[in-house]
Each structure stands twice: as C-alpha cells, then as structure tokens.
Regions:
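Positively charged n-region of N-terminal signal peptides that target proteins for export
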Residues: 1-5
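C-terminal motif of bacterial Sec signal peptides marking the signal peptidase cleavage site
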Residues: 15-16
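Short, well-ordered, aromatic-rich surface patches in folded extracellular/luminal domains
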Residues: 19-28, 92-165
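Post-signal peptide N-terminal segment of mature Sec-exported envelope proteins
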Residues: 25-44
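Short amphipathic beta-strand/extended segments with alternating polar/hydrophobic composition
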Residues: 38-41, 56-65, 116-126
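A short, structured beta-strand/loop element
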Residues: 42-50, 102
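A short-motif feature that recognizes glycine-rich, charge-decorated loops
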Residues: 52-86
Length: 165
C-alpha cells in the first residue's frame, strides 16, 4: 500500500500537474482545419469554419481535451523558455526549393491570466510534411504536439485530414 501511495505522488508531481509558474489561461490554434479553442475549464474544442457564404460560423466539436494534453503543451512552453520569445514570433519553412510561396500558416496563440497574448506562427507551403522543414529545434516540439492534437480532434469528429502530397 505504501508503494502505491509513493507512485501516485510521483505521478502527480511529474506527469499530471501543470508547471510551477503556469499563468496560461487558454491556448488557441489556427490552421487550415479551422480555429481550435483549447481550455482546461471548457474541456471542449470550438472550431470556426468559412462557409460558402463567407460567414464565419462557430461549430462546437464534441471532443474532450484532456488536461494531460494541455499540460504537456504548457510544459513544453515553459521548459523550452518560450516565454522569452517576442509577443509576435514568426518562422518560415526551410524549404527554399518550393515553387509555391509560403501560404499556409499554423498559429498558436497563448492567452495569459494577466490579459497578455503571445503569437507563434509557422509559415509553410503545406506540401509533404511541414514539420520536416521546421527551422527552430526549440519551438518544434510544441508544434508537433499541437499538430498531433488537432489531427486527433479532426479524425475523431469525422473530418479526416488531407493526405500529404
């Protein structure tokens, strides 16, 4: 019984708790699939899509976002010192041979409890796997985690992701 208690405390300390200096209120991800509002309090993802009539509609996707996923994104944010980045940080793909200009953006917006925001944007032409051409090794893990989470949400709600060309 004593060992189970020790393992439980270790689990809480290392895996399920948020970072000590956590002041992130919510996380918003914008990409070609839509806009995903991720929040621990809401536990749902809201997605905006353009309709044929050029209106921006909000569609509630019935998908639970686990605290584990959000805490992992927060942990990557703080462990890689991304709070030291400027409030609007843009990255371009390392794909210099592309015939297409960078046209698809994946943007992560962090909303903080003090009302501030931080935008991290990655521009790429969208062909093949964009994460293979990611320029900054320090920021890449957070984009990998967000890409996996949005892919999981889209696939589980019946909206299959497009096959890379």
């Amino acid at each position: 019984m004593k060992n189970k208690y020790i393992y439980f405390i270790a689990f809480l300390l290392f895996y399920s708790c948020a970072h000590k200096k956590d002041n992130i209120k919510s996380i918003v991800v914008k990409n070609w699939k839509g806009t995903f509002y991720l929040s621990e309090g809401i536990q749902r993802v809201y997605k905006t899509r353009k309709t044929p009539y050029e209106k921006d509609t909000i569609k509630e996707v019935p998908f639970k976002v686990s605290n584990k996923s959000i805490n992992k994104i927060k942990r990557i944010y703080y462990d890689n010192d991304l709070e030291n980045l400027p409030n609007e940080h843009e990255l371009n793909s390392t794909n210099k041979d592309s015939i297409y200009p960078p046209q698809e953006a994946t943007q992560i917006i962090f909303y903080f409890q003090d009302g501030k925001r931080k935008y991290i944007t990655f521009w790429d032409d969208g062909y093949n796997n964009p994460l293979d051409r990611f320029p900054d090794k320090k920021i890449k893990p957070i984009f990998e985690e967000v890409t996996q989470l949005t892919k999981k949400i889209s696939d589980s709600t019946g909206e299959r992701t497009k096959i890379p060309r």
